[in-house]
Amino acid sequence: YGYRMTAEDFINKGQLHVTHMPGNAKKADWMAFINDFVISFGRKLIDMVHSYGKKAYVFYDDSWVGVEPYNGRFQEFGFDGLIKCVFSGYEARLCAGVDVPTHELRLHPYLFPVGLGGAPTFMEGGDPALDAKKYWNSVRRALLRAKIDRIGLGGYLHLVEGFPDFCDYIEKVADEFRLIRSFHDAGEPYHIKTRVAVLHYWGSLRSWTLSGHFHETYMHDLIHINEALSGLPVDVKFISFEDVKNGILKDVDVVINAGR
């Protein structure tokens, strides 16, 4: 790249470089540099998994630095599937929009004694069935717009023994999911003619997301817009200012610019 990075390039006067802020050329160079390494090393690991007749999935959450499912190079890894844990509809769209054979959602609440912020979940005082209903209501509307192949839960299975109402509700969720998936197998969902573009610095690289889950980024307008759009019957694309310069707006009816 012809130059050295400095500490300030990362610290950015204390603002860091979270993706709900505009980036710069150095940030883009760093992301490309890391992406090159992760692809080259990750592909070796995936080939190793495949050599034993197994499939390789990537968990699109806790740490996906250098994976970049939306930068056009994700297919170079050779992953067989993508797993995304979801609280909200936009996260379901984030998973569904990646070009990979299998898309899977990990539903909340996780099978842990406590949940967000230390609140009781699968323990005295918890109501995991109510939590599951709240999250499923948000996720389900997005599933009607984009196909997901599988759903699942994570955690300690024995914890559900004392919560039969949770087990009954998850059975209902599974049945609803199978029905929704069958709709997608039958054909594309209905869309009205309106074509919406969300415009910000990152464009398609940060389709359907900012810097984390809804409860971590609720203070930013853009996450609310993403969530609203995730279940609406409109065509949605994420575009950058460079895309605008190249004439992409000729194929767009509504432009939303709600970045920082």
Q: What are the roles of these predicted feature ranges?
A:
Residues 43, 50-51, 62, 88-111, ...:
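Carbohydrate-binding surfaces of carbohydrate-active enzymes
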